[in-house]
Amino acid sequence: MLTVRLRRGCLALCTLAIVPALGLAQRSGPNPFPGGTNPDGSLRPTPPLSRLFTQDAYTEYAILAPGSEAFRIRFIPEETRAGATELVNATRGGSQGSDIEVYDPRTGKPLKFTYQDEGSDTHAIHAALPMPVPEGGVGRVLIYKTYKDPRTYTMHGEDIVWVRSLSGYRLGVLLPKGFSFLSSNVAAQLTTTADGRLKLAFANPSGQSNPVTIHARRTTAAFPPRNDPDMFFDDVKTLYDLGAPEGGTIKVEQTYSDYRKGDKATLNSLEYLPLTDLRVVDLDTAKTLAVVKNGAASAVKLDVPIVDDRQSAHLQITGTVKDAAYKVVNGELVFERTLHGLRNTVLLPAGWDVAAVSQSGTLGTYQGRAFVALINLNAENNYRVAIRARRGQ
C-alpha cells in the first residue's frame, strides 16, 4: 500500500535516486520548470504534477463589519513530517494578524503558540503540536485569527468589495449579516448559516489558487438558516491503488475527519467499500483502532470522545477490494466505478498510459505511475467514472 501522507519524503528520495543528473543540471543551470511569469507576463512552465492529492487544508474567511477592513479566519492545516513538534503558519505581507487562538482538533483544548516577526513585513504563528508527529501519523491544529488588510477589504460607497488570491485549499467565505451578494467570480455552493449569514463554499478542481472578487450590498431580506452540508469542508480523500488489471484487485486508502459527537466513529464508507484486510488508524497518534461490528454497521471506539465543535477524529481506513469492473478489454485497461466524496485519485499500474477519462480530472505521475485526480464539485456525493489506459511498449 502506498502511503499518501509520506508522499513528499518518498518523492524526494526517489527523485534523488533516479535522476541525480537532473539535480546536477539544475544546480549548474537555470530551473527548467520555475513556474510564475516572464517579464512580459507570459507563463513559465511548472514541474509535472506528482502529488496524489491537493487541498488538504481548509480555510474559512468571515468578512467582518463594513469599514473594519478585517476578516476572521478559521484555518485547519496539517504537518506530515514525522517527528515535527510545531506547525508554522505565516501571515501574508500587508495583513495584520490579531486575536489568535490555536486548538488541538483531537481534544478541543488550547495549544501554546507564538506570533513572531519573520522580517520583510511577514509574521508567523508557531503552534506547538500536542505531540511530535508520529511515524505514519499526521499533525494538525485549528487556528482562528483576524486579519486587517485594506487591500483585500474595501468599500465602494455602501457596498463591500473583497478581493484576495486564495491558496489552493478547500475554502469558505461568509458575508456580514444583513448583506447579500451582488456578484462572485468563482463557482461556489451558496448557503445560509445558523445565524443568518450567507456563505460561499468552493475549491479549485485543479488545486491552483483562486483569485476571488466579491461584491456585496446591504439587504432587508431575511435568510433563514439551512442545513445544507458544506461539501468543501468535508476533507475525505480516497486513493485507489490499482493492481494488475487481470486480477481486478484494488488497494484502497481513505483518510477523513469525523466531527460527529460521541465516543465511537461509524465507518460509513464500508457500505460502498467492501474491504478485506481492513485496518483503521487514528492519524493523530498513528494507533491502530479495533473495528467493532454492530449488525451491518462497523465502528471504532475513540480514545478521546468528541464533545464540542472544535473536535474531530482524524482516521485512515485501508484495505483491499476486488472489483469485476476493473479489467482488461481488448488489450485496454478499464476502471469503471462509482466514486464517493470530494477527492478521489486513481493510481494506475506501472507501464500503463491514460487513454480516456469520463469525468474532469487532472493527470500526473507518481513514482513512475500515471494517476488521475478527481474533485467532485457537485452536491451529490457520488458519481460514475470510467478510466481507460493502454500499455506502453
Task: For each feature predicted by the language model, list its residue ranges.
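Bacterial N-terminal signal peptides that target proteins for export
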Residues: 2-13
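C-terminal beta-strand-rich structural cap/linker in extracellular carbohydrate-active enzymes
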Residues: 197-225, 370-393
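Beta-strand elements of well-folded, non-transmembrane domains
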Residues: 65-69, 75-83, 145-151, 177, ...
